[in-house]
Amino acid sequence: MRCLKSFRHGFTLGTNCYEPGAKRPRGDRSTVGGWSHGSTSRNIAFLRSIDEAKLTGHALALTLTVRDCPDTSDDWYKVRRAFEMRLRRLGLIRMHWVIEWQRRGVPHLHCAAFFDDTAPALLPAVIMRSWCDLVSDYNASPLSQYVLPITDAIGWFQYVSKHAARGVNHYQRSPENIPPQWQKKTGRMWGKVGEWPVVEKAEIFMGDATFYQLRRIVKRWRFADARASGSIHRIRSAKKYLQVPETLSRVLGASEWMPENELLSILYFLKSQGYEFL
C-alpha cells in the first residue's frame, strides 16, 4: 500500500504498512539523544502544516547562544523554560523553537516568536537583555545574539526554509557536535508554544502504478523548480534526486515542499489519465 500525505505546503510519499484508517501502534517514549530522522520529519510536517495567512502578531526571528556550554541538558532546559516564561510576560502569543549545535560543541536556540500589541516598543533589545541575564553563568555576549523582525509571509517562509531544509546529517544537527556530557540525554530538539493555525494533513492511498508515475512527475517538477530558481546548487541536487539502485527504487519515497494547488493539479492530471487512488 502506497500513501501520500498532503500538507498545506508539501507532501510525503511512501510505502504504508497499515490499511487506511487503521490505528498505528506507538512505541514507548525514551530519552532523547539529539536529532533523529523521526524528530526531523515531525518538525518538517508541523512547519508544512501552518496556515501562514492566519498568523497574527508581531513576529521576530531569534538566534541565541552562549559562550560556555551548560554542564547538563537539564541546565539548558531550565534556561529555555525560564526564557519562555519571560517572553510570555512580554506578550508572547506563540513560538516555534529549534536547538542546533555549533562546531565547538555548544547549543544555540533558534526561534520564531509572535507577540501581541502589549509588547514593549524596544522588544528586540528587551529580549536580548533577558536572554543574557538568564545565561550570565555561561558568558553570553549581546553581540552574539540576533533578534530580527519577520515582516511578512516571505520573511516567515525564509525562516521555515532555513530550519526545515536541514536534515539529521547537517553539521548543526550532527551527533558529532553534541557536547560530550550531553551524549546520553539532550532533551527535546524542537517544540512549539501557544496556538498555531494549522491545516490537517490528508492521506491518499494508491497502488504501485500510480505511485511510480507520481514519483516521476515529482522528479520533473523538482528539476523545473530548481531551474526556475537559477540556483546551481539546487539544479545539481535536483539532477541526483531519486537516483538509487533499482532494488531500492521500488520502495523509495519522496518528500517535497510544494504549493498545495500544484500538488492538486498533479493529482487531477493523474486521475484524468486513468491512474487510480484507493
UniProtKB/Swiss-Prot annotation:
Coiled coil: none annotated. Pfam families: REP_ORF2-G2P (PF23343). It comes from the Viruses. Keywords: DNA replication, DNA-binding, Endonuclease, Hydrolase, Ligase, Nuclease. Transmembrane segments: none annotated. It catalyses: ATP + (deoxyribonucleotide)n-3'-hydroxyl + 5'-phospho-(deoxyribonucleotide)m = (deoxyribonucleotide)n+m + AMP + diphosphate. One of its GO terms (molecular function) is DNA ligase (ATP) activity. One of its GO terms (biological process) is DNA replication. InterPro entries: ORF2/G2P_dom. Its EC number is 3.1.21.-, 6.5.1.1. Changing Y77H: In strain: New York. Belongs to the inovirus G2P protein family. Isoform G2P plays an essential role in viral DNA replication. Binds the origin of replication and cleaves the dsDNA replicative form I (RFI) and becomes covalently bound to it via phosphotyrosine bond, generating the dsDNA replicative form II (RFII). In turn, viral DNA replication initiates at the 3'-OH of the cleavage site. After one round of rolling circle synthesis, protein G2P is linked to the newly synthesized ssDNA and joins the ends of the displaced strand to generate a circular single-stranded molecule ready to be packed into a virion. This is Replication-associated protein G2P. It comes from Pseudomonas phage Pf3. The lineage of its organism: Viruses, Monodnaviria, Loebvirae, Hofneiviricota, Faserviricetes.
